[in-house]
């Protein structure tokens, strides 16, 4: 029997925030307060499409966490560690409170991003809505 190395390259997940979401308000929190790259056009897609740029170099800095601040050209298709090496993760947030995360390459990163969204929802959205 020949053994083949296994490399996890894509993990998708879904969860609920437990309440309905005012997408305009949540979108404004994500883009204005956190400076995140997100798109929300309800005429073409029913959810907020958030891009989280994972990079070990910025994870400990809350001012830039989730954003690409690379000096080198970066497409978001890197390994997630180093200048120009961000790993782009897509997060879709719907009015129902359902959230879909796609593009993670490890359970640890998935759990971190899951907590990141839940914390913004709890600390920013629920307290100011």
Predicted ranges, named:
Residues 20-22, 98-99, 105-108:
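Conserved beta-strand elements of beta-rich interaction domains across eukaryotes
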Residues 90-93, 98-103, 117:
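Short, structured motif recognition centered on aromatic/hydrophobic residues
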Residues 1-93:
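Intrinsic, low-complexity N-terminal interaction/targeting segments
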């Amino acid at each position: 029997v020949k053994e083949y190395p296994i490399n996890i390259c894509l993990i998708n997940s879904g969860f609920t925030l437990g309440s309905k979401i005012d997408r305009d308000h949540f979108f404004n929190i994500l883009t204005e307060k956190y400076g995140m790259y997100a798109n929300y056009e309800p005429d073409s897609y029913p959810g907020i499409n958030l891009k989280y740029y994972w990079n070990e170099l910025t994870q400990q800095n809350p001012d830039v966490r989730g954003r690409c601040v690379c000096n080198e050209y970066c497409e978001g298709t890197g390994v997630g560690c180093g200048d120009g090496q961000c790993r782009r993760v897509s997060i879709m947030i719907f009015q129902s409170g359902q959230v879909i995360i796609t593009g993670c390459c490890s359970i640890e990163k998935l759990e971190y991003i899951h907590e990141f969204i839940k914390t913004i929802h709890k600390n920013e959205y629920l307290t100011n809505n």
